[in-house]
Amino acid sequence: MLFMINWSVDGGNIREANERFSSGEENFFGCELIGRWHAPGNIGVLIIEASDVVSINKYMMQWDDLVDVSVTPVMDDAGALKSLEG
């Protein structure tokens, strides 16, 4: 399953979040990072592939003290086309 994770960092947590991200010690708990994009204003989005929501939750728990997130299951074009089949 694919999951879109929108994230934002509160101004008071920017330094610590940047240090944690720069450390390279991020654990994906069996999830596969498809892509991550950063935008001005301390916001961004990730696409992660995972077999279950538990893995996503474990991944997010390492950031929940610094980052606000929303997680949405998503599908690619092939999945969207399958959903249109009767």
Label each residue range with its predicted role.
Residues M1-G86:
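Conserved, structured core segments of small domains
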